[in-house]
Amino acid sequence: MWKKPAFIDLRLGLEVTLYISNR
């Protein structure tokens, strides 16, 4: 079982990357 915080961190990082790329 992987930790949820890690999943949230990865998801947040991905969203931030997409946001910056979309700018």
Curated annotation (Swiss-Prot):
The keyword Transmembrane does not apply. Coiled coil: none annotated. GO terms for biological process: pyrroloquinoline quinone biosynthetic process. InterPro entries: PQQ_synth_PqqA. Keywords: PQQ biosynthesis. There is a cross-link at residues 15-19 (Pyrroloquinoline quinone (Glu-Tyr)). Pathway: Cofactor biosynthesis; pyrroloquinoline quinone biosynthesis. Required for coenzyme pyrroloquinoline quinone (PQQ) biosynthesis. PQQ is probably formed by cross-linking a specific glutamate to a specific tyrosine residue and excising these residues from the peptide. Belongs to the PqqA family. This is Coenzyme PQQ synthesis protein A. The lineage of its organism: Bacteria, Pseudomonadati, Pseudomonadota, Gammaproteobacteria, Enterobacterales.
